[in-house]
């Protein structure tokens, strides 16, 4: 965060610098960009992150923020595998589109299956009111809860996550160059293009489902 640890003259920049050196060897800790435009209008005490996968802030079904919400189901796309199996860039996007569609279908299937499970499967979550609207479900018996879709009232506030691994390796395959700082810097736009391609699809599904 600017004025905290972002710039070299910030009070805690030394801690941020140390953290990045640790990340270079151990992949931890997890970072949160407090100046992210996606969360600028949300109470900073209600924003949360889950590892490297999900920023929990926006909510199309209820209250914004991370409180009483979580990742309901997740899936990861292996970008290098798709790139390695592609003959050219157009073929890559065609395969990526297919994999994204399959990922979406799998997540929806997981979500629907969870919502149909008997309420006893989520007793600890419900008794402690960990999820939004979970107090509604625990007041009813299993049959009533299932018939009234009470689990869905809780889980619909969660997130379905499509993650990915290996963006740098993916680009390396596509441009047929070894990974290096120069290769990464000269192909930043291709990297952004791939991310925009996936983001466009997930934004569409958020509105549709």
Protein language model regions, located:
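Conserved catalytic cores of very large enzyme subunits
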Residues: 1-156, 177, 184-209
